């Protein structure tokens, strides 16, 4: 190989692959790929990105510091990353039909933190959905910054319907007069009425923030009503149903708000943006603007309904009786099971999900009375209704086996794992 390097180690630095330079890390990555390829992923917050998104994230853009915003950077040499970030911003605005977008937050939690930094003061009252009802840590949960720096009031769900009771939300808002009301969550299977939330916010003079992280893909395709006509500010992750890289984003239609948001993201909360991730976000937004993405989201929702229906026939209780979205909560109490034990048994059988509290759960967060299931990742790899019927019955088999033997039913779990592996081999990843 011809080169001008005086030091041969530099030649290796620029040319040698990971497998040759760090076999320990390479082995870990390969093992994780095998796990993803051979198991069924039902964690509702996970998805599978396209090869193009993955390629964009693994580029030389990781080398570039770009503190600031396009056209207003603190470093030189940013003309090309400016172009990439501008593409991401314009595509995000088009995708969600809004006026302004900040694509720099490293995560959904960072996006939520930036909104609070921009629009609130420590000690202000905020109102968000409680964790046990389907909310998120960043919406005012005690262990999180949002629960420590602010006077956090939590709303829940109706004891009968297990859905949001907007009259109860209004009564709580009138009583506590929050500076900000947060709508959205991490385990809400039904459509959220953002217009009703805005009415309540206006009545008490509150800012309405919507966290659409879980349903951003549904909103992008019109499968769920958009919060943008109603919310003052909207946050989201860029993975989950949006099927992009792990990251966050903030959207608004208000110029005075985006100015505060931009200052809160940088220099308020973050330093240099991750330009390789922003490039991957731009690619994912471009994919989501195509007609294939709408077909994908429609299938995600259809598959979720199929899975919920099969589980109901197998004696599982689905919280709210079904789902309008990509996810469902399975109440395991009728089977006498705990969420942590069900999660472990399903993983032994090659099906990955997460234990999850259900509304009014009396179990501890690391135990729980339920599991949360979602269809985005399975749908991304090509599973349709017939495959999700099989998956529903496999879950039923594993849970019934666990009822018979609370320590795990090896015979059932090994049989299901073999069938899972055979199904996954028909829908391989990145071939």
UniProtKB/Swiss-Prot annotation:
The keyword Amino-acid biosynthesis applies. It is an enzyme of class 2 (transferase). The keyword Transferase applies. One of its GO terms (molecular function) is pyridoxal phosphate binding. Keywords: Amino-acid biosynthesis, Cytoplasm, One-carbon metabolism, Pyridoxal phosphate, Transferase. It holds the Pfam family SHMT. Its EC number is 2.1.2.1. It is found in: Cytoplasm. GO terms for cellular component: cytosol. Catalyzes the reversible interconversion of serine and glycine with tetrahydrofolate (THF) serving as the one-carbon carrier. This reaction serves as the major source of one-carbon groups required for the biosynthesis of purines, thymidylate, methionine, and other important biomolecules. Also exhibits THF-independent aldolase activity toward beta-hydroxyamino acids, producing glycine and aldehydes, via a retro-aldol mechanism. This is Serine hydroxymethyltransferase 2. It comes from Vibrio vulnificus (strain CMCP6). The lineage of its organism: Bacteria, Pseudomonadati, Pseudomonadota, Gammaproteobacteria, Vibrionales. The gene is glyA2.
